[in-house]
């Protein structure tokens, strides 16, 4: 027999990430129960489920917009959960609370994440409608052209060397 069990890693993109997160609502304890070593979730659609799952995994996860944000020195213990979410991805940022609450990605001081329009401000109802319309164009991609924007993560998927370092 084998001396060591193989490592089990989860990978999910968009709705695939959402489904996996729904299956393990308790975060680490569910990962342990299922024998999962680590997870990489890409472009998880927003909403209350996403907010609560980020909260459950906050002490053991890192959220990045692109691979260049991966720290040279990883924290100890190494994060088990990685979220790759573009700052300007409306699919990730859209949620019902936009109707009535200013999102963290649109702070009053005017700072913006990459690809969040500089002139965008939060207005009750308006920002919700704008983000809703933006979701319709978030996957408007050109074949063969990998861009690091919207809900197109092809240019930002980590290569094997990076994945081995992270997970």
Language model feature labels by segment:
Residues 1-6, 26-167:
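C-terminal His-loop and adjacent cap/lid subdomain of alpha/beta-hydrolase
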Residues 10-17:
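Gly/Ala-rich beta-loop-alpha elbow adjacent to hydrolase catalytic centers
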Residues 17-29:
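Short glycine-enriched nucleophile-adjacent loop
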